[in-house]
């Protein structure tokens, strides 16, 4: 893999911060965008900008074709059966809110939802809101001190009242890869086909090839901006047979068939779930990002990212005072650590002075932080353009600032 050629596709990597070359290690928060994505969005606004669907004029028809072609690209990328299984959203958060609202509308008081201890707040709070509204109970898969989910607990957690399991593919705070195949297998064997399995793929989609047929989840959500595409657009994949049974999430244009004051009938999936004017330019950018990725050998990319993770863990483990979380777990993309009892904000602030961008805090995963009895962590997260030289700069930066902090 020609890492230097890849890096040249990302203009922002040439920037300087505080007089230092940018070392961007905050990819779990958002990835940078290649030139082809920026140019595709600019080209759309220069030449094709129009609202999609129902327009008889040429610009609208061209914009609609572009918009729907990306839906087909996403279908292929996920190996979904039909484009009707691909719903555009604003991101993973909206996708999970959509599912929490629609999947629970017909549940009974006392029915149960299973989440995990390692979830991002976006895969906790929407389910809590739905549970409070409908009298549902939430149960939790615990994790061990390496951040690994205790999947054997599902044998006791799943019962006849269990209706939904929603788990992340990869922990956003620790980078731990969860054993989805085992979770879904237990869901099917213990809960049957009526037990819905939702996967938060926000941190998984960028570091692995996702095949929803092989995975056999009922729903899979991700955000485009974690996949080298723009902010403002996301995807929910859902099995068509289930989507057709779900009520709308929001009301407005496009999601209807016919509106009257006495009765309104709703569109078919996916349009039933896409009320209002969509983020067309962002969708075009997503298509460009997928095309960019499809030109690469993704198996080679993922192997390279694993190499970067191993190297980062090796380099940081050798630094006195650095404590790495989930050190022995299978991880991808993110490495969480602390420096002694120093607040991670202080670590991040000093590294920023050296041009190094990391994320600090609880990473919208407060239950994880409570598990370890810490306020937060420093998190370095990687992408296909991350180099070993950048990891060295991070390690050298930590060695430089630690004497100032301890």
Where are these regions (language model features)?
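Pyridoxal 5′-phosphate
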Residues: 1-406
